[in-house]
């Protein structure tokens, strides 16, 4: 199945299940093989078998939800996700996918699912992705940037990460620094973390005389980290900012910001920069490859 040969996977799994008919992992693989082959009728038959099992795990409910979604059976899809979340209320993938279903229905309580996923299962990337995109289209200036950058670091090689980098650059340009007073429109925020973020960012606005570019963002974000750790880090410990400070201390924060923003602002300029700063760029890539970015529990500050 890993090689995309779903027909052969189905043949092998069907025969294996004749010998071990109650093997949960093989039943899940068979359902997913039919799903990836787009044989949704047979995928549904297998999904129902999974969901009828007393030992059905969270993945079984994901499979069922995905199959019903592919069949555009919205009510059944929602029923499956609700049943899964009743059994596994803190499962990040289920919260993420149920939120996506609500979003497709234009039910904006979807953000409640994604925020809960971030709070109870912070190591799962999908909720950061969905929440960042949600906040980008609201008046909020903070959380699309925070969640978006977390997502890019958790899922750095995916196509979604490339799209999120563009969203981040747009967020700094079109939202955070669009007004001279960056707190404008944020007066109703209940999050003390958000207020602290805006306080530190607002003090760097004088650096924007040349607009928002990768270079100015690097300067702003460098000074932000120094300000944050001077005033707020003790009150709001946060892995993302710990990581940024570590990059500063290692002398590769400039390369990180080029990787984060330069690739979408101007790819040719980014290539020129990497050649001119070959050692720093290679040090950053080597550093990045040796670490898995993961948010810990207990660092949730989105008071809505």
Regions found by a protein language model. Give the residues of each.
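Register position in tetratricopeptide repeats
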Residues: 2-3, 36-37, 70-71, 103-105, ...
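TPR-repeat structural position
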Residues: 6, 40, 74, 107-108, ...
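Single-residue signature of alpha-solenoid repeat helices
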Residues: 9, 43, 77, 110-111, ...
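Canonical positions in the second alpha-helix
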Residues: 15-16, 49-50, 83-84, 116-117, ...
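Short coil turns that delineate tetratricopeptide repeat
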Residues: 21, 55, 89, 122, ...
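TPR alpha-solenoid repeat register
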Residues: 26, 60, 94, 127, ...
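Canonical tetratricopeptide repeat
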Residues: 29-32, 62-63, 97, 130, ...
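Eukaryotic alpha-helical solenoid repeat scaffolds
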Residues: 123-304
